[in-house]
From Swiss-Prot:
This is Sec-independent protein translocase protein TatA. Belongs to the TatA/E family. Residues 41-76 are annotated as: Disordered. Its main location: membrane. The gene is tatA. Gene3D superfamilies: 1.20.5.3310. It is found in: Cell inner membrane.
């Protein structure tokens, strides 16, 4: 009573196929498969980029901007 037999699952499958149709189920399966593949590729790309050491960037003094700070007065 607690678990479903193979016959229960077959009946559910037939009802789902009658309600949605095989073409709609196939499209849903393709969309889901594409999403899973994209997720796996994204995870693999993230691991590859994380494994490479970060290239050190050289900062030059000419990129420094010299400005005078202004005081702000608080109005209440």
């Amino acid at each position: 009573m607690g678990s479903f037999s193979i016959w229960h699952w077959l009946i559910v499958l037939v009802i789902v196929m009658l309600v949605f149709g095989t073409k709609k189920l196939r499209n849903i399966g393709q969309d889901l498969g594409g999403a899973v593949k994209g997720f796996k590729d994204g995870m693999k790309d993230g691991e590859d980029k994380g494994a490479q050491p970060a290239a050190s960037k050289e900062l030059r003094d000419s990129t420094t901007i010299d400005v005078d700070a202004k005081e702000k007065s608080r109005q209440q």
